[in-house]
C-alpha cells in the first residue's frame, strides 16, 4: 500500500522536531520584504535574516515544508518525470548551530530508516576538495557509494562574492530501464536514471573579490528535498506525477475533457495538474491575474493550462473545477485553502472566460494572418503584427509563438521586443513627473542622516532639527522664500504616506521661517521626506524647527482608518474568512477598501454591513494600540496584510467588543486611529464595484465626510423635488411617471424613424453583389442606432430572401455594424461571426457573434468607407 504524501510530510517535520529543530510554517509564495525575488523558490528564502545573523528569533535550528514556485523549467513540465512549477520543499536548517556531521547522519537516517529506502540504491556526491565531509560520509555509507564532483555541481555560491560552500547531494538509482542505456552510466550522467533527492549545502566560506575563501564566523546548514520526488521514490514510482499529489487532479481533468489518462494525453494532463496546483496556491497567497509581475506569470500559466483543453475541442472553463481537487489533496497541510475555495474558483473561472473570448477572436485573426504569410511564402511573422495582436487584442505573445510554430512559422522576436520597448518608453514619458524619485539617492542620504523619529502618534507638533535640504534632486545648504524643496528632519509629527493611509499636511516653521508641507513620503526605510513650499524666510542645515500638522485633517483620516478596520471585520462576519484586504486608500474625503470576494454585493448586503459598522460606532468601544511580539499577535488572531514584512515587534490596533472583555477587531497596523469608535460619528457606504478579477471595492465615508455626503444627497432630493414639482413623498411616483412618458415618446420617435428607414430599403437592395453564388450587400446608414441597423437588416433579408448583409452606422466618433446571414447561406458555410471579426480587424475594431448574426464596432473611422466597399472579400475566406 502506498505511503501518503501527507504522512511523509508529517514524518519529516516530526523527525527534525525530535532533533531539536523549530517547526516553522511555510511562508507565502510572495517573498516577504525581499524585492529581489518574484516568488519564493526555495526553503531558505524565509530564513535569509537568520543566515545573516540579523533575526531576533530565539531558535538556531529549524525545519519547514515550504511552498515554492519556479518557472525556469516551465517548458519541460509534463514532458519529464521531475520538472514542476509548484512544489513543496522539505528542509532543515542550522544558523551557527549543528553542521556537517549531524546534517549527513540525520539525512541518511531519515531516508533509510523512516522512509525505508534501500541503502544499495543510494549514492552521495560531494565536492572534490571537501575532505571533512568525505570522512563523515565514509562512517555512514559504503565508500563505493561516495562520488567526488567538481565545483559546477557540488559547490554553492550566492554570487561572485559572499557566502558560499560545498554541498552533498543524495541520489537514488531508479534502474537501468530509466537511463540512457550506456554501460558507463553512473551518477554523473545527465540521464533520468539517477534522481537527486536531497541537497545538503554547507555554507562555511566568504568568497573574496580575488576568488580566495575565508572562513565564516558562523557556519550554516541549508538543505532541500522536494516532497513530490520523495513521495514518488518511497512508493516506487519513476515519475512525480504518479503520486497521490497529482493523480486525482489528472483523473478529473481527463474525465472533464473526455479523454483517457494514457498515451499522448499524459503530458498534457500532467501539465494541467501541475499548473492547477500552482494557480490554486498563487491566488491563495494573494496574487491576482494581471499584465505585469507576479500577476502576469499567474495569467500565463492559467492560460497555458486552459489551452490544453482546446487541443481536445473543449472550449469551456474547467481549470476552476480542478481547484477543488487540489484543495482535497492539500487542505490538511494548508487549512487556509478551505475558506478561500469559492473565491479562488471564481477568480479562475472569470479569467478562463475572459481568455476563451480572447482566444476565439485572437485565434481567428492570427489564423488569417498565418494564412496570409503562407500564401506569400513568408516564414517569419513580423514583430509589428505580433505586437499588434498582443497590444490591441490582448493575445499573448507566447501563444502567438506557439501557434506560429504549429503552422511551421516563426516570429520576429527582436522586432516584437523593439515594439514592446517603444510602447514602454511612451508609457514612461506619460508617467514622468508623477513624483517618484531615485530611491538610490535617498538610500545614500539615509546612511548619513539616519531614520526620522516619528512623534505623531502622540503629538500633533514636535521640535526638530534640519538634517538635510534638497532641491531639484540635489542636496543644498539652504532654502529661501519661494523655493520648492525637500526637508529631512531628526523628528517629525507628520505621518508619511504608507500602508494605504494618506500623508499629513501642515507647516514646518520657526521664528524666522515658514513653509507649507505639501507631501510626505518614505523612499528608504523610515527616512521621512517633507516636500515643502517656502512662504517666508531662510532655512539652513542644523536649524531648529517645529513641525505642526493640520489637526482636523489628521482626525478625519483617523476616523476613516478606524472605520476601514470595522468594515473589514463586518465583511468577514457577513461573508466568511476568505475575505482579506487586497488594497486600500485612506484619505481625508473618503476611504477605499479592496477585498477578495467572488461576486458583487447586493444592496441588502451593503445595508447590513453599514448597519453593523454603525452599531459598533454607537457602542463607543475603546480603540487600543499595543506593541507585541509578532507570534503573540498572530496567535491572538490579528489580521496581517499579505506580503508585508513585519518585524519581531508589531504595532497592533485592537477595537473592543460589545462587552469590552475581548476584541471585536485586531489588525497589525502602523496608521493613525481614533481613541474610541464613537469618535467616528457615522459611517456611510457610497459605492461597491469590481476592482479586479475576484476583488471587490467599497468606497465609503465617515465623520464629517459622511455628514457632507448626506447633506449633498439631501440637496439633490430637494432640487429634484422642485424640478418635478413634487414633495419628497411624491418624488418616486412622479419620477416613474415622467420616465414612463419619456419611453412612450421615445418609442413613437423610433417608430417614425423606422418608417423613414423603410423608404431606403429599395435603394439599398440595388447595391447587392454576387460573390461565389452568394448575395452580398454592404451599406453605410449614417447615424443609425443599433436597433435601426437591425430593422434595416431584417427588412433587407425579407426583401432579398437569401443574402449576407453588412449594415454599418457611422457617428461622430464611432462606427457600429451588424452582419447577418440568412439560413440558406449559413448552410452553404457562411459564418457571420467569423466574417464580422475579419471586417472588424480591418477597421481596428472588435466583433463577436454566431454563424447567422454578429455585431461589432470601432473608434477608428479613417478607413471605414474603403473597408465597407471591400468587405465582399471576406466571403471568400
UniProtKB/Swiss-Prot annotation:
* PROSITE patterns for this protein: AA_TRNA_LIGASE_II_ALA (PS50860)
Under Gene Ontology molecular function, one entry of this record is: alanine-tRNA ligase activity
Xref: InterPro entries: aa-tRNA-synth_II/BPL/LPL, Ala-tRNA-lgiase_IIc, Ala-tRNA-ligase_IIc_anticod-bd, Ala-tRNA-synth_IIc_core, Ala-tRNA-synth_IIc_N, Ala-tRNA_ligase, Ala_tRNA_ligase_euk/bac, DHHA1_dom
Question: What is the protein name given in its UniProt record?
Answer: Alanine--tRNA ligase
- Mark the transmembrane ranges: none
GO BP, one example? alanyl-tRNA aminoacylation
Q: Which reaction does it catalyse?
A: tRNA(Ala) + L-alanine + ATP = L-alanyl-tRNA(Ala) + AMP + diphosphate
Keywords (alphabetical) are: Aminoacyl-tRNA synthetase, ATP-binding, Cytoplasm, Ligase, Metal-binding, Nucleotide-binding, Protein biosynthesis, RNA-binding, tRNA-binding, Zinc
Which NCBIfam families does the record match to this protein? alaS (TIGR00344)
Which EC number(s) does the record attach to this protein? 6.1.1.7
What's the chief localization of this chain?
A: cytoplasm
Please tell me where Zn(2+) binds in this chain. 561, 565, 669, 673
The family note in this entry says: Belongs to the class-II aminoacyl-tRNA synthetase family.
Q: Name one GO cellular component term.
A: cytosol
Q: Which CDD domains match?
A: AlaRS_core (cd00673)
Q: Which cysteines are joined by disulfide bonds?
A: none
Cofactor mode of binding and number, as noted: Binds 1 zinc ion per subunit.
Amino acid at each position: 500500500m502506498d505511503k501518503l504524501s501527507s504522512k511523509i510530510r508529517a514524518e519529516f517535520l516530526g523527525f527534525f522536531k525530535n532533533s531539536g529543530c523549530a517547526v516553522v510554517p511555510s511562508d507565502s509564495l510572495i517573498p516577504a520584504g525581499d524585492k529581489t525575488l518574484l516568488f519564493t523558490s526555495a526553503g531558505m528564502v524565509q530564513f535569509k535574516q537568520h543566515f545573516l545573523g540579523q533575526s531576533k528569533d530565539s531558535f538556531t535550528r529549524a525545519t519547514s515544508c515550504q511552498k515554492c514556485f519556479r518557472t525556469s523549467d516551465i517548458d519541460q513540465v509534463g514532458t519529464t518525470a521531475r520538472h514542476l512549477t509548484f512544489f513543496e520543499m522539505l528542509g532543515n536548517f542550522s544558523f551557527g548551530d549543528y553542521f556537517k556531521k549531524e546534517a549527513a547522519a540525520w539525512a541518511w537516517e531519515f531516508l533509510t530508516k523512516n522512509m525505508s529506502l534501500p541503502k544499495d540504491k543510494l549514492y552521495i556526491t560531494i565536492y572534490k576538495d571537501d575532505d571533512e565531509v568525505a570522512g563523515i560520509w565514509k562512517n555512514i555509507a559504503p565508500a563505493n557509494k561516495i562520488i567526488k564532483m567538481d565545483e559546477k555541481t557540488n559547490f554553492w555560491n550566492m554570487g561572485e562574492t559572499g557566502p558560499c560552500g560545498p554541498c552533498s547531494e543524495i541520489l537514488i538509482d531508479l534502474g537501468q530501464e530509466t537511463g540512457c542505456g550506456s554501460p558507463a552510466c553512473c551518477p554523473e550522467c545527465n540521464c533520468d536514471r539517477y534522481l537527486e533527492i536531497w541537497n545538503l549545502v554547507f555554507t562555511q566560506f566568504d568568497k573574496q573579490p580575488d576568488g580566495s575563501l575565508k572562513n565564516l564566523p558562523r557556519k550554516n546548514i541549508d538543505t532541500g528535498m522536494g516532497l513530490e520526488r520523495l513521495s514518488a521514490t518511497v512508493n516506487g514510482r519513476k515519475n512525480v506525477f504518479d503520486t497521490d499529489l497529482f493523480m486525482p487532479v489528472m483523473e478529473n481533468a481527463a474525465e472533464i475533457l473526455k479523454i483517457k489518462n494514457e498515451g499522448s494525453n499524459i503530458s498534457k494532463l500532467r501539465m494541467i495538474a501541475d499548473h492547477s496546483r500552482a494557480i490554486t496556491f498563487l491566488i491563495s497567497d494573494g496574487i491576482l491575474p494581471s499584465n505585469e509581475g507576479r500577476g502576469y506569470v499567474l495569467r500565463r500559466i492559467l492560460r497555458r493550462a486552459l489551452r490544453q483543453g482546446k487541443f481536445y475541442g473543449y472550449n469551456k472553463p474547467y481549470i476552476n473545477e480542478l481547484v477543488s481537487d487540489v484543495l482535497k489533496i492539500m487542505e490538511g497541510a494548508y487549512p487556509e485553502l478551505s475558506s478561500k475555495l469559492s473565491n479562488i474558483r471564481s477568480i479562475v473561472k472569470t479569467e478562463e472566460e475572459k481568455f476563451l473570448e480572447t482566444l476565439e477572436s485572437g485565434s481567428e485573426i492570427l489564423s488569417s494572418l498565418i494564412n496570409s504569410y503562407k500564401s506569400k511564402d513568408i516564414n517569419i511573422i513580423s514583430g509589428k503584427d505580433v505586437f499588434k495582436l498582443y497590444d490591441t487584442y490582448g493575445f499573448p505573445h507566447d501563444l502567438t509563438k506557439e501557434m506560429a510554430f504549429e503552422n511551421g512559422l516563426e516570429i520576429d522576436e527582436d522586432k516584437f521586443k523593439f515594439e514592446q520597448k517603444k510602447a514602454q518608453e511612451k508609457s514612461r514619458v506619460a508617467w514622468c513627473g508623477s513624483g517618484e524619485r531615485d530611491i538610490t539617492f535617498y538610500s545614500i542620504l539615509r546612511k548619513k542622516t539616519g531614520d526620522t523619529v516619528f512623534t505623531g502618534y502622540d503629538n500633533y507638533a514636535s521640535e526638530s532639527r534640519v538634517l538635510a535640504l534638497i532641491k531639484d534632486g540635489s542636496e543644498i545648504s539652504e532654502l529661501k522664500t519661494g523655493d520648492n524643496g525637500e526637508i529631512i528632519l531628526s523628528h517629525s509629527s507628520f505621518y508619511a504616506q504608507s500602508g494605504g493611509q494618506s500623508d499629513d499636511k501642515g507647516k514646518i516653521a520657526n521664528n524666522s521661517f515658514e513653509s507649507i508641507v505639501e507631501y510626505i513620503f518614505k523612499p528608504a526605510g523610515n527616512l521621512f521626506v517633507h516636500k515643502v513650499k517656502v512662504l517666508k524666510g531662510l532655512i539652513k542645515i542644523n536649524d531648529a524647527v517645529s513641525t505642526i500638522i493640520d489637526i482636523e485633517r489628521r482626525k478625519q483620516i483617523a476616523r476613516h482608518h478606524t472605520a476601514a478596520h470595522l468594515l473589514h471585520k463586518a465583511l468577514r462576519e457577513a461573508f466568511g474568512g476568505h475575505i482579506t484586504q487586497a488594497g486600500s486608500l485612506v484619505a481625508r474625503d473618503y476611504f477605499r477598501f479592496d477585498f477578495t470576494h467572488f461576486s458583487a454585493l447586493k444592496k441588502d448586503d451593503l445595508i447590513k454591513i453599514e448597519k453593523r459598522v454603525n452599531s459598533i460606532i454607537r457602542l463607543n468601544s475603546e480603540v487600543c494600540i499595543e506593541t507585541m511580539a509578532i507570534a503573540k499577535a498572530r496567535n491572538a488572531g490579528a489580521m496581517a496584510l499579505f506580503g508585508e514584512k513585519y518585524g519581531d515587534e508589531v504595532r497592533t490596533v485592537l477595537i473592543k467588543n460589545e462587552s469590552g472583555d475581548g476584541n471585536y477587531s485586531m489588525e497589525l497596523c502602523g496608521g493613525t486611529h481614533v481613541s474610541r469608535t464613537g469618535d467616528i460619528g457615522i459611517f456611510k457606504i457610497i459605492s461597491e464595484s469590481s476592482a479586479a478579477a475576484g476583488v471587490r471595492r467599497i468606497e465609503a465615508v465617515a465623520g464629517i465626510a459622511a455628514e457632507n455626503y448626506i447633506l449633498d444627497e439631501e440637496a439633490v432630493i430637494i432640487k429634484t423635488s422642485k424640478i418635478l414639482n413634487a414633495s419628497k413623498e411624491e418624488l418616486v411616483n412622479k419620477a416613474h411617471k415622467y420616465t414612463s412618458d419619456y419611453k412612450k415618446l421615445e418609442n413613437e420617435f423610433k417608430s417614425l424613424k423606422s418608417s423613414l428607414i423603410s423608404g431606403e430599403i429599395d435603394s439599398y437592395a440595388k447595391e447587392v453583389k454576387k460573390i461565389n453564388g452568394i448575395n452580398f450587400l454592404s451599406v453605410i446608414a449614417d447615424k443609425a442606432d443599433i436597433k435601426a441597423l437591425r430593422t434595416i437588416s431584417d427588412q433587407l433579408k425579407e426583401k432579398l430572401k437569401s443574402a449576407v448583409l453588412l449594415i454599418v452606422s457611422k457617428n461622430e466618433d464611432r462606427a457600429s455594424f451588424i452582419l447577418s446571414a440568412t439560413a440558406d447561406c449559413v448552410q452553404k458555410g457562411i459564418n457571420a461571426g467569423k466574417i464580422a471579426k475579419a471586417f472588424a480587424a480591418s477597421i481596428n475594431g472588435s466583433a463577436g457573434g454566431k454563424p447567422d448574426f454578429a455585431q461589432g464596432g470601432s473608434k477608428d473611422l479613417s478607413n471605414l468607407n474603403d473597408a465597407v466597399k471591400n468587405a465582399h472579400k471576406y466571403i471568400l475566406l
